[in-house]
Amino acid sequence: MARIAGVDIPREKRVEIALTYIYGIGLTRSRQILAKTGINPDTRTRDLTDAEVAALRTVVEGEYQVEGDLRRQEAMNIKRLIDIGTYRGRRHRLGLPVRGQRTRTNARTRKGVRKTVAGKKKAPAKK
């Protein structure tokens, strides 16, 4: 198993797909990296030579922000929004959708499990 940016890349998958297991690398960026290193996207990870793995590691770790660094930067960006008190920061703090989606219905993923609110009780019947 090749290890790039602290992630074990799956051996049986094509390199193009295997690189997407690294946080911060999608299919497009994976193709850019392979073009830069001159590696055929259709080769399997198990067939890569040590030199090719080293070239991939150099490009990924040198030119792109991935894994822990990227997660840390995203967390800091959200924390900055919260600290300066922007609308987006308040939405993050309250755990509500940030990008203008409706919340009267839907937004269940962001709001969490539905909390039932008791309905109004009927008055007792008079005799």
UniProtKB/Swiss-Prot annotation:
rRNA-binding found in the keyword field: yes
Protein name (database record): Small ribosomal subunit protein uS13
Region of interest (Disordered), ranges: 100-127
Subunit structure of this chain's protein: Part of the 30S ribosomal subunit. Forms a loose heterodimer with protein S19. Forms two bridges to the 50S subunit in the 70S ribosome.
InterPro entries found in the cross-reference section: Rbsml_uS13_C, Ribosomal_uS13, Ribosomal_uS13-like_H2TH, Ribosomal_uS13_bac-type, Ribosomal_uS13_CS
PROSITE patterns assigned to the protein according to its UniProt record, in alphabetical order: RIBOSOMAL_S13_1, RIBOSOMAL_S13_2
Biological role: Located at the top of the head of the 30S subunit, it contacts several helices of the 16S rRNA. In the 70S ribosome it contacts the 23S rRNA (bridge B1a) and protein L5 of the 50S subunit (bridge B1b), connecting the 2 subunits; these bridges are implicated in subunit movement. Contacts the tRNAs in the A and P-sites.
Gene3D superfamilies assigned to the protein according to its UniProt record, in alphabetical order: 1.10.8.50, 30s ribosomal protein s13, domain 2
GO MF annotation terms: rRNA binding; structural constituent of ribosome; tRNA binding
One Pfam entry name: Ribosomal_S13
Any one Gene Ontology BP term: translation
Keyword terms of this UniProt record: Ribonucleoprotein, Ribosomal protein, RNA-binding, rRNA-binding, tRNA-binding
Any single Gene Ontology cellular-component annotation: small ribosomal subunit
Basic residues: compositionally biased ranges: 101-127
Keyword RNA-binding: yes
